[in-house]
From Swiss-Prot:
Catalyzes the phosphorylation of the 3'-hydroxyl group of dephosphocoenzyme A to form coenzyme A. Residues 3-200 form the DPCK domain. The keyword Nucleotide-binding applies. ATP binds at residues 11-16. PROSITE patterns: DPCK. CDD domains: DPCK. InterPro entries: Depp_CoAkinase, P-loop_NTPase. Belongs to the CoaE family. The keyword Oxidoreductase does not apply. One of its GO terms (molecular function) is ATP binding. The gene is coaE. This is Dephospho-CoA kinase.
Length: 200
């Protein structure tokens, strides 16, 4: 089984691309989805112990947690020390299931793939990319997003140009959905030797 690592800076279309891989029949693991599950499950008491007042009714309040760690590298390290091992456990379970299902390709969607060294655990890296103006427009259209938040997020992410230079495949997400589907189908066919499943 070939494991693809999908990554890209915020607002580059990672979630959309991951959804299209899934539509094409590729098992997909999302680190972000895992974090959401963990924040309302077993990570919540650990986060409350580390950052008191950030959990309400057993669920991590993401806004409060963001305020507790923004601009504080040591606090971010503490949070990562709690969350990353749990996310990794979920990823390992996903890989076992995908392998058992006989999948030729599986995809792990990890926003901080390079930043956390996770590229060492995948066979090929796929980076989603779009021009900076499109990226900023997409991100600032999100509810609750501000220029300050965007800057804080981008500071922690390796620049897009470097990600592209380290990728095995680059998906240009600035065009139409059909164009993106075509790019994804080419990757799947090239790696598996079989046409991608129907994406509609």
């Amino acid at each position: 089984m070939i494991v693809l690592g999908l990554t890209g800076s915020i607002g580059m279309g990672k979630t959309t691309a991951a959804g299209m891989f899934a539509e094409a029949g590729v098992p997909v693991y999302s680190a972000d989805d895992a974090v959401h599950r963990l924040y309302s499950g077993r990570a919540a008491p650990l986060i409350e112990a580390t950052f008191p007042g950030t959990v309400e009714n057993g669920i991590v309040n993401r806004e409060k947690l963001f305020k507790a760690v923004i601009g504080q590298p040591e606090a971010i390290k503490k949070l990562e020390a709690v969350v990353h091992p749990l996310v990794r456990e979920e990823e390992d379970a996903f890989r076992r299931e995908a392998e058992k299902s006989g999948a030729a390709i599986a995809l792990v969607d990890i926003p901080l793939l390079f930043e956390t060294g996770a590229e060492k655990r995948v066979d090929k890296v796929v980076v989603v990319s779009a021009p900076a103006d499109i990226q900023h427009t997409r991100v600032l259209a999100r509810p609750g997003m501000t220029q300050e938040k965007l800057k804080a997020i981008l500071v922690r992410q390796i620049p897009d140009a470097e990600k592209r230079s380290r990728a095995d495949f680059v998906l240009d997400t600035s065009g139409s959905f059909d164009d993106l589907r075509r790019q994804i189908a080419e990757i799947i066919t090239g790696l598996s030797g079989k046409p991608a499943a129907a994406t509609r």
